[in-house]
Each structure stands twice: as structure tokens, then as C-alpha cells.
């Protein structure tokens, strides 16, 4: 039995046991992923989707995250200009081994769906959640922009009271951003109300 699946804008004809190099997926080595975009199932009774086969899926195990071979992009302006540029590129890929082709019941398996690079986007809201709990808007202090406020929150200083309570040694120990004495004075005023 074989299946035609779609991932990363490409289509692959696969069987159980095949090893594929697909566009980078948000999964670590050893994890199981499921491709839900199945265009066709083949075998004794072929099924062609319109455009997808309902309930069908292909499960795979992630072997490794790799880079493809280097592609050289060479640009040369001929004749009077005599300029040239060479750039190389190695595409990020995921190596997967097909373990199973499901003809039905794909939504009940509990295996996570294979998606692109969503790991970085998922981490950003998780980092913003601790900042929202019991913190002040540090950008109200003159000279503290959004980037400096974010670095202060990452250093554990998320409120005016925490910034006002810093000693000179603690201020010197903060490497992420240079805390100015005016910031501490303004934080004391804002913490009092």
C-alpha cells in the first residue's frame, strides 16, 4: 500500500519504511508526527481525494534535523561592470521514516500533526505570560524603551518596586541592560503612586 502526501509545498509518494527528506518540521529527533494532507491512497482499492482523502493520514518518526547540500548562487554582471557575487545556501530539512499509513481514524490517534517551524512562535506567548502577571509597564520610565523593558523583565525586574529596591551591586550585576540612576529614582516615585 502507498500514499501520496503533501508537506512543505511538495508531494511525496510513500510506503511504510520509506525515509524522506522533507522541509523542516517543528519536531525533535525521536518524536512521532502525523501528515494529515493525504492526496491519494493506493493499493488493492485506490482512493483519490478531492482534494484530500477524509480521515486518512501518514504517521512518521523524526530521525534527525539536517541541512541539505549547498547550492551556490553566482551572479556576474558582464562587460563594463565587472562585478560578481557568490552566495551559498543550505536548506534546513527534516529526515523522517514512514511508520504507518492510516486509511481512516486519523483524528483519533493522538499523534501531533506535522507542521512547519511553529516552535519559535509558540515560545513567544509563553514568555509574555509571566511578564503580565504582577508587573508594571516599565516603559513609563523616561529612557526605557520596549527592548530595555523586555531585558529587565528577563532579568527578573518586572515592577517599579523591584527596580526601586535595587542596590548599587545588583545594578552592576545586570548585564542585559545598563540601569541608569534616574531610572531607579523614577521607579521609586512610580511605585509610591
From Swiss-Prot:
Pfam families: HHH_5, Ribosomal_L21p. One of its GO terms (cellular component) is cytoplasm. Keywords: Ribonucleoprotein, Ribosomal protein, RNA-binding, rRNA-binding. It comes from the Bacteria. One of its GO terms (molecular function) is structural constituent of ribosome. One of its GO terms (biological process) is translation. InterPro entries: bL21-like, bL21-like_sf, DNA_repair_Rad51/TF_NusA_a-hlx, Ribosomal_bL21. Belongs to the bacterial ribosomal protein bL21 family. This protein binds to 23S rRNA in the presence of protein L20. NCBIfam families: L21, PRK12278.1-1. Part of the 50S ribosomal subunit. Contacts protein L20. This is Large ribosomal subunit protein bL21. It comes from Ruegeria pomeroyi (strain ATCC 700808 / DSM 15171 / DSS-3).
Amino acid at each position: 500500500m502507498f500514499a501520496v502526501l503533501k508537506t512543505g509545498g511538495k508531494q511525496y509518494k510513500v510506503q511504510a519504511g520509506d525515509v524522506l527528506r522533507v522541509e523542516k518540521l517543528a519536531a525533535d529527533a525521536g518524536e512521532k508526527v502525523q501528515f494529515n494532507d493525504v492526496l491519494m491512497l493506493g493499493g488493492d482499492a485506490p482512493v483519490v481525494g478531492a482534494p484530500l482523502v477524509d480521515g486518512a493520514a501518514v504517521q512518521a518518526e523524526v530521525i534527525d534535523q539536517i541541512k541539505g547540500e549547498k547550492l551556490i548562487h553566482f551572479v556576474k554582471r558582464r562587460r563594463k561592470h565587472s562585478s560578481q557575487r557568490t552566495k551559498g545556501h543550505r536548506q534546513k530539512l527534516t529526515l523522517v521514516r514512514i511508520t504507518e499509513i492510516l486509511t481512516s481514524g486519523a483524528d483519533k490517534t493522538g499523534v501531533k500533526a506535522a507542521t512547519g517551524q511553529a516552535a519559535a512562535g509558540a515560545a513567544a506567548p509563553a514568555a509574555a505570560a509571566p511578564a503580565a502577571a504582577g508587573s508594571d509597564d516599565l516603559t513609563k520610565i523616561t529612557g526605557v524603551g520596549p527592548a530595555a523593558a523586555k531585558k529587565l523583565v528577563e532579568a527578573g525586574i518586572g515592577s517599579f518596586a523591584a527596580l526601586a529596591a535595587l542596590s548599587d551591586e545588583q545594578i552592576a550585576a545586570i548585564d542585559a541592560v545598563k540601569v541608569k540612576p534616574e531610572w531607579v529614582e523614577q521607579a521609586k516615585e512610580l511605585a509610591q503612586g
